[in-house]
Amino acid sequence: MLKDSGREKISDKRIDSPVSDDKFINKLFERLVALKVEFKNVDFRYCIFDAAYLRNCSFEECDFTGCRFINCNLAGCSFNGCKFDYASFDKSQIDNDILDVGCPGPENLKLKFARSLRMNYQQIGDAKSANKAISIELQATEDHLHKAWKSKESYYRKKYKGLDRLKVYGEWLEFKLLDLIWGNGESSWKLFRAVLVVLLIITAIHVIGFGNPSLVESYVEALWMSPQVFLGIVSP
């Protein structure tokens, strides 16, 4: 049985004066315009902002829980003490300092928030902001997986029991292993270190199996050959 969701559509409106202690819950704002407007303690829960132009506005203690920002321009906006639980962003211009002041507290919500912004920045070609979001997403993912199997917090112990707890422990181990090897794709130094370790192992195996461990020349020759063995160009 289909019922009306009760979402009100507000199209082609402009806000030109400060807004304080107001509620706009479950609204669809289409092409909303505001420039250098102050919003204080405004409730925007579950709103959808479609093609909104909100440049250089300030938002203080506003609630954006469950909001969606689609094709919006939020450049120059500041957010202080705002709530972004379950908020998502799609092809929207927004300064990356929101990652410093807007992340939700719980790790599972923080990683979803950072992931949404990371994908958003990738969509608009902002590599620097995407990298910043990735760093926060990875740290939040590690913290979430660690708490999921180890924390005594009621949320985690209620959600992850028995085999689910064991499974998430395996995911945490995999995450830590990939972080150790190559920083989950974000650390060139860790990748270089991992390759160097592999080359040294190949060198040691070659010297023990085919060279003379008492001769320095055997180590030099084996080390010289190790990249070719690693790449499959030659056989040991």
Predicted regions and their residues:
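Tandem repeat scaffolds
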Residues: M1-I136, T141, K150-S151
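Transmembrane alpha-helical segments and their cytosolic interface motifs
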Residues: K159-G209
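Pore-loop/selectivity-filter region of tetrameric P-loop cation channels
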Residues: I181-N184, G209-P236
